[in-house]
Amino acid sequence: MSPSANFSHFLLIILALLKGFPYLKGIESANVVAENYSIRVASQSSARVHEDEKETRISEALNPVLVLDNTVTVRELLKEDPFSQWTYRSRWSELSDLELTSDSMSKAIQAGKASRLKRVLLKALAGKKINVVIVGGSNSAGGKLGVDERSLDGLYFNVFTKWWNETIAKATNAFVKEYGVTIGGTGSYVFAFCYKTFIPRDLDIDIVLIEASINFNIRGKAEPLEQLTRQVLSYPSAPAVFYINLVSGLGLDPTTQKVINPLCTNLENFRQAELAHHYGISSFSLKEVLCRKKDEGWEAAVTNLAGSDGRHIGIKAHAQVAMMIIEHVRGVFKEVINDVTNNVNANEIASLALPELFFLKSKTEALSDPLCWTGLTPNVYQSRQRSNLKLDVIESKGFYRKGGSKTGQYSDGNNKTDLRTDAQGGWTAWNDHSILKLRILVPPLNSRTIPESRSVIVVAHTSGYGGEAKLWLDDNKDRAIYVDSKANFGNNLLNTVATRVDPGYHVVTVQTLRWGMFMVSGLFVGPPDFNRREVL
């Protein structure tokens, strides 16, 4: 085969790997491009095709020579020991330093389908920027690292992206940019409704890290995570998705000096692994490292890697998770390089179609074009939330708008930021008989298979000094729901006010019933039959 034929064959392999690749903005479907290019090569035509502009755009999006050069360089990088590359090489230089073994690592890294990640890594070989979104709770927002380490550099995703930028990116120029959507006391449902409103419009997301194994409750179990997963997987750029499965409370309670969570309970107790398998998600389980199986359950085995509060994970546990992600990405990267260098065509082209529902019982409960207004924020220093719900306050008696203070508050209500930027916020009242009326526009649900009506949901923030309120829609006071926001921990719980709501303008009324803080931290519009109470 001539050199020119080899080059043409190589380009076809790259295009085949990129079939359906949504990152190539400004060009037609990569599938069509690959077919058109294949026809031209097969015909051996010397005539120039009158599509110079399209071919220019293709070359701008994908430079095969650059991909080949970067493949050679990255292959050599992947031969090196990752412990010699990462930021902790002088502190933890081998698995045993992290209290890990090859066996525990293999159990902790639970690989899913790699096709989406492979396309991201091929994009990196082409020198394109990689966008990573982190969705999670207080551990991802910083936990106690700011207090214990005086820095948030040790967050698991920061360690991973620093490794990437100092190794892969230096060779390819494919630097990672992070977008944090991390808020303490917040579970998967809030993120399923709202995560898009916290990132730039039309952002090409490449990888999403979902840390949701701690912030859940028994009412919802893993169903909220399924809703979030479906929302992320259906994002236009078809990102690769990882579950970051942490465990809270593996330290000692400062008062009792006993392990707070001795049974290592997290969302993995409630069929999260089955959910990951159903959707082909790769998971990284801290439970497999810090806990051990006993009879039919689990028990805490390593209790010295928690933060100073005994609840959040400490810096070494963050490092363990980071190394899991690094090892997984390295392994898949080696497969991609083998595919490219050996001219192996990609037989598995990732389908963007979602599989059937798993925990959800009906499509009329599954989120589709959800609308979100929220006073929560992952960063009090940036006004990033782009509410997609039209909302007006038409009456406020005793309620005031509480936003996150820059000198601020922790998400759990403490008055010290500890370098964290996440904060609670919303419409807040302390006195009884306070009234809040919010006028919202409920648009029709554009679907051929389910009704165009919607559901209306209020998010209330719980606290140890929480109040109580009744909530209703329009004039339906006789159908009011009652929400008690007093709880041991500060969480953001969803409560459906009404289902099968016709399109148009509607008014949500909140009336407090006793003294205490009642905070409306969010207002959502969901699918017709989304009827949930006190889910996280």
Q: What is each model feature region?
A:
Residues 1-30:
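N-terminal signal-anchor transmembrane helix specifying type II single-pass membrane topology
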Residues 96-100, 139, 145, 177-196, ...:
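Cell-envelope and extracellular/periplasmic
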Residues 85-180, 194-204, 450, 456-472, ...:
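Serine-esterase "nucleophile elbow" of acetyl-processing enzymes
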Residues 133, 280, 299-360:
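Histidine-centered active-site loop/cap adjacent to the catalytic His
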Residues 87, 339-449, 529-536:
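Glycan-recognition and processing domains
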Residues 503-505, 513-536:
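Exposed low-complexity, polar/acidic, P/S/T/G-rich flexible segments that act as propeptides
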Residues 115-120, 188-200, 223-231, 267-271:
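Alpha-helical scaffolding within the catalytic cores
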Residues 249-288:
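Substrate-gating cap/lid alpha-helix
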